[in-house]
Amino acid sequence: MDLFALLRAGVRSGDTPDIGGSTDDRWRELYTAASSQGVSALVWDGIRRLPPESQPSRELRLRWAYNVERIERRYGQQRRRAAELAAAYAEAGIRTVVLKGLAVSRLYPVPEHRPCGDLDCFLCGDYERGNRVAEQVGAEVKRDFYKHSHIVFRGLTVENHRFCTAVRGSRRAKRFERHLQRLLAEGPL
């Protein structure tokens, strides 16, 4: 049983994993590996493409499905909190660009199955004003990092990036950063 075959089937619509039979012990190992790597929901999507006789035991399927439900609920909560914070930024006239995390999940067949730990955003030159707006809506803001602040808003962790890239110590990165910021200033991507 190959974790990568199941993962591939989970993220590529139409793929059916070519997997032989597997023991309960091997299925438990796969469950543990998928969970520890943060891909259990994606692997679950691959398992659901297997014929019933090739799937894990009912007990493990129920456990796996419950875990996937938790991931889906957390994703929904993250989306709602992100929308609330983005609305507060928009109301303050701050343009928000999502850099990764939740935005990347939209590229998956089932976005809710691509877990993310936080939301990374760039506020198009309004870094500090964005921090103040976040505080005004009840978020905790830590400004201890050169590249971004850490915002915790109703359970959602947000990295408000001062820069799109890591610019320290590299002229090339600084030039690239200026180029990206000019593109963002021109309007929607």
List each model region and its residues.
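Conserved NTP-donor binding/palm subdomain of two-metal-ion nucleotidyltransferases/polymerases, i.e.
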Residues: 1-117, 123-189
